[in-house]
Amino acid sequence: MRKFLTLFVVSFFSLTSIVSAEVDFAGKTITWVVPFKEGGGTSRFARFIQPFLTKYLPGNPDIQVMHIPGGGAIKGSNYFQENAKADGTFLFGCSTSVIVNVATGNPLVKYNLSEYRPVLLLPQNTHWFTRSDLATEPHDLSKLIERDLVLYALKTPASADLFHIWVFDKLGLKGAKPIPGLSSSGGYQAFLRGEIHISSHGAANYVKKVKPEIEQGKVVDLMTLGIIGADGSVSRNPLAPDAPTFPEMYEKINGKKLEGDDLEAFYSIGAAWSQASKSMLLPENTPDEIVDVFREAARKMVNDPEFKEKASKALGPFPLIIGEEAGEIVKKAAIFSETTKDQLNAVLKKNRFTYQVQ
């Protein structure tokens, strides 16, 4: 019996080694499709990871980043769906914008995002802040809640900016009014000029642009979205550890914990807006052995001394999510429940938008 078990174990690991050995990208070129222009956040994410992935994939393949911007990321995303081969020679650079197109039912979407095979996710986080004259102290919304008019930027209700409308509604900012067509960068400039009352940024721009204003006393933190763990717990953002998370602020304002349909909506929004902010995906139907090889390369990459040294500055302080957990997050982000859609549509209607989540 012992001899049989020994033979079984040896045979099993030999078979595993054979399967891994069969995945070899020597002499091959991998095309990483990024549905945005060169120089944007998803582009920088791909180009930072590119040399490390080449280093740790078997055969050290050449990886070329292909930018296909247009249509709010739909042009490049549809191209990937229609042209990518499930043999490990195509990668997709996904972002919140790509996910929102699916989750909100954009009829132009042809890509089957929820069936793609995630290799890794790069979480990000949203910081909200206001001018110091509009808050009694940091993390205080009382003055903004009392105002009849609280202006903020909104690029389009069909983008991730939709989530701002939901957040402000849940916090009782009755005077909150979006200015459609104003991008995040344009909105921040308008904020600095005193033309709008509340603004937000992701991690990189928060550190680069907002923190200096906070240190000069011109701007104060309000809150962050929060870091959502695999168990559903929400922790504070290490870049602003004193700032409450959205669930904390919700409880402070409403006198009760975030729960039920509101909590479900928050988890879906958090998955799309934070946990899966940037990601590297393989096409649907990619064989498990190829997916495993990419994930193993990603695990080796994050332990590379050079990667560790440079990643915090290039990617932010949040650890990459690798493997099966990443797949569950992408599905949660891309498929909104009917109750979540109802909540989003209700706040859209309240703000007089004709656009509706499908």
Model segments located where?
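Periplasmic solute-binding protein
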Residues: I99-P107, L121-A135, I165-W166, K170, ...
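A conserved helix-loop-strand patch within extracytoplasmic ligand-binding domains
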Residues: S114-K155, G172
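N-terminal (or domain-start) structured segment
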Residues: A21-Y116, T156-A160, K170-E213, V302-I321, ...
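Bacterial N-terminal signal peptides
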Residues: T6-T16
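C-terminal lobe and pocket-closing loops
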Residues: V210-V302, K350-Q358
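A structural signal for short loop-to-beta-strand junctions that line the ligand-binding cleft
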Residues: T89-F92, L108-H127, L151-A153, D221-L222, ...
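Secondary-structure end/capping motifs
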Residues: A271-T339
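Short coil/turn segments
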Residues: G39, T96, T126, R131-T136, ...
